[in-house]
From Swiss-Prot:
This is Glutamyl-tRNA reductase. It comes from Bacillus subtilis (strain 168). It comes from the Bacteria. One of its GO terms (molecular function) is glutamyl-tRNA reductase activity. NADP(+) binds at G189, A190, G191, K192, M193, G194. Catalyzes the NADPH-dependent reduction of glutamyl-tRNA(Glu) to glutamate 1-semialdehyde (GSA). NCBIfam families: hemA, PRK00045.1-3. Belongs to the glutamyl-tRNA reductase family. GO terms for biological process: protoporphyrinogen IX biosynthetic process.
Length: 455
């Protein structure tokens, strides 16, 4: 079995691609369930945010896993593999584990140390648990990822003066307007990104806040928290005529503000400039808005400069986080090694108990007049002998699992005791047990036995 990550992120793909390869929150459960039916996929979790869409999977073979995940993404988003492939990133085995931990800690984010991604990883983990698309390996891996993410923010200063993409949007507004106390801010979208933008703006002492959302009650809840005004979506055009700054993050599948709508709003603006920041993926604001006089449009990719300026101190703190990640990688590898040893120990016990059972059958045939009590006594003592004989080999095989060359040593151990085939069967049982609802018949069988995730 192997751990594999396939996806796109802000480093590998421009926003035009990321918005095409983005799962809506209400699609994640269905997507994970559908993906688990693909050949080679044993466990899977999908993490999809404005800056990344990544599939984490346990696969039986790396090459088939890569193929079927690429096929799944292309089919789901109705893209050709040729369109998608140049932007995909791949992480395998140890690199995949390290990548997940870096993501959970915020080290792989556009804004280093941001906390929002940890919540998104945790939410995807919960969804996968509910939909039963994960088993033994990812239950442990993602628990450790969430734990190291929490430790990062508890034990280091990387989250101090917390920033995010929405914070960067506010910073950009400050650079353009200076003091925001007299400005009218329009927030389009009352989701998490809109909420973060409102929080950051509130900290800057803004003049007036208006919140618009498809669901009016949700807009009102957010507006009330910051003494603002809520409006319905059909009032968007009039709100655009009044605002100085627009921050948009609805997550809609099509443009919410069109060029035509803004042209109508501009007639009432009397030449006043409008600063617009689109932090949604897919984008909310038509790029053609940039052609209009007095409109200054920025999208999520334009925020990189602001983000970079705020990150120097966090990069220094990131070195401490790297140490936490290294510790957690070691812990996970030790756990994986122990997991790999379980089938070996089970196979050894199985063989020893089979010998004990055959011996008891032979004794009972040769001594037919043994009483039930005598048979039970013999059975108990022969099993005791077996357990005593197995004690040292089992302790030794557990020690071998911690060695750097454990895979080769375990293979030799199995060869000495002639239990390769039995260990392979035990590993199959482990996989099937961890995949309670996954039909293992769909995965290609793999000859031999590999107790570890390959290096």
């Amino acid at each position: 079995m192997h751990i594999l990550v396939v996806g796109v992120d802000y480093k590998s793909a421009p926003i035009e691609i990321r918005e095409k390869v983005s799962f809506q929150p209400n699609e994640l459960a269905e997507a994970m369930v559908q993906l688990k039916e693909e050949k080679s996929i044993l466990e899977n979790i999908i993490v999809s945010t404005c800056n990344r869409t990544e599939i984490y999977a346990v696969v039986d073979q790396l090459h088939t896993g890569r193929y079927y995940i690429k096929k799944f993404l292309a089919d789901w988003f109705q893209l050709s593999k040729e369109e998608l492939s140049p932007f995909l990133t791949f992480y395998e085995s140890d690199a995949a584990v390290e990548h997940l931990f870096r993501v959970a800690c915020g080290l792989d984010s556009m804004v280093i140390g941001e906390t929002q991604i940890l919540g998104q990883v945790r939410d995807s983990f919960k969804t996968a648990q509910q939909e039963k698309t994960i088993g033994t390996i990812f239950n442990e891996l993602f628990k450790q990822a969430v734990t190291v993410g929490k430790r990062t923010h508890a034990e280091t200063d990387i989250g101090s003066n917390a920033v995010s993409v929405s914070y960067a949007a506010v910073e950009l507004a400050k650079k353009i307007f200076g003091n925001l106390s007299s400005k009218h801010i329009l927030i389009l979208g009352a989701g998490k990104m809109g909420e973060l933008a409102a929080e950051n703006l509130h900290g800057q002492g803004i003049g007036k806040v208006t919140v618009i959302n498809r669901t009016y009650l949700k807009a009102k809840e957010l507006a009330d928290r910051f003494s603002g005004e809520a409006r319905s979506l059909n009032q968007l055009e009039s709100a655009l005529a009044e605002a100085d700054i627009l921050i948009s993050s609805t997550g809609a599948s099509e443009f919410v503000v069109s060029k035509e709508m803004m042209e109508n709003a501009n007639k009432l603006r009397k030449g006043r400039p409008l600063f617009m920041v689109d932090i949604a993926v897919p984008r909310d604001l038509d790029p053609a808005l940039n052609d209009l006089e007095g409109v200054f449009l920025y999208d999520i990719d334009d925020l990189e400069g602001i983000v970079e300026a705020n990150m120097k101190e966090r990069r220094e703190t990131a070195e401490k986080v790297e140490l936490l990640i290294e510790e957690t990688i070691v812990e996970f590898k030790q756990w994986m090694n122990t997991l790999g040893v379980v089938p070996v120990i089970s196979a050894l016990r199985e063989k020893a108990l089979a010998i004990q059972s055959e011996t008891m059958d032979s004794i009972e045939r040769k001594l037919p007049h043994l009483s039930t009590r005598e048979k039970k006594l013999l059975n108990k003592h022969t099993k005791s002998i077996i357990n005593q004989m197995l004690r040292d080999p089992i302790l030794k095989v557990k020690e071998l699992a911690a060695d750097a060359d454990s895979e080769e040593k375990l293979a030799l151990f199995m060869q000495i005791f002639d239990i390769e085939e039995a260990a392979g069967r035990q590993m199959m049982k482990t996989v099937e047990s961890s995949q309670k609802v996954h039909s293992f018949k769909k995965a290609e069988s793999k000859a031999g036995f590999s107790p570890l995730v390959s290096e």
